[in-house]
């Protein structure tokens, strides 16, 4: 499955992501999330052929948490179903010597008019 995400902040900075969920026996991890980041000029933030990969650390019928560990830095991205029409996505980052980061993105299904 593929998807995209755009985050525009009040200070004018923004981020665009293309995401791919991989759930096949041939994948590096049985269930993983690959992300390619772009800036507002649509330039890749990772190296040309690189992407960020996170593996599933927790998986239930209503929640999945992906994790990446790299030289002391830990990044976790989670998605949790909060009701029939609500989803909470979140991002956590911990790096030695830096303040921890936690950002939440609540989503509610839009109703057709």
Regions of interest found by a model, annotated:
Residues 1-70, 75, 110-113:
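Central antiparallel beta-sheet cores of small beta-barrel/beta-sandwich binding domains
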Residues 55-56, 82-113:
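Edge beta-strand at a domain terminus
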